[in-house]
A protein has these predicted regions:
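Acidic, low-complexity/disordered tracts enriched in E/D and polar residues
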Residues: 1-48, 94-95
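Long, charge-rich, low-complexity alpha-helical segments
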Residues: 35-96
């Protein structure tokens, strides 16, 4: 079980980790050192909002508004997804 992320924390992709479009498979992937994580549409939507400036809460607010979804549900999903990536060392969380 992933620990809840601080909503004020600012997610950033660490050095050597980046979003990439895999043209062969036609999917978005997260590339990290010696690993690749294929993303579904939701994962890509979340990671495309990670800019190193906005907090987890701000990203959740923007996604909830964009997709017309309940803020509490989106916030929980964003926190869980980013927390999983942080546990895998594919994401860092800076103090907000």
């Amino acid at each position: 079980m992933t620990a809840a992320l601080d909503p004020a924390g600012i997610p950033v992709l660490p050095r050597g980790v980046r979003l990439h479009h895999d043209r062969v498979r036609g999917v978005e992937v997260l590339l990290g050192p010696e690993r690749t994580l294929m993303l579904d549409g939701i994962g890509h939507a979340i990671l495309s909002e990670v800019d190193g400036a906005r907090s987890v809460a701000a990203i959740s607010d923007d996604l909830a508004a964009r997709f017309g979804a309940p803020r509490d549900r989106v916030g929980a999903d964003v926190s869980e997804f980013l927390g999983d990536l942080a546990e895998k060392r594919l994401l860092d969380l800076q103090d907000g």
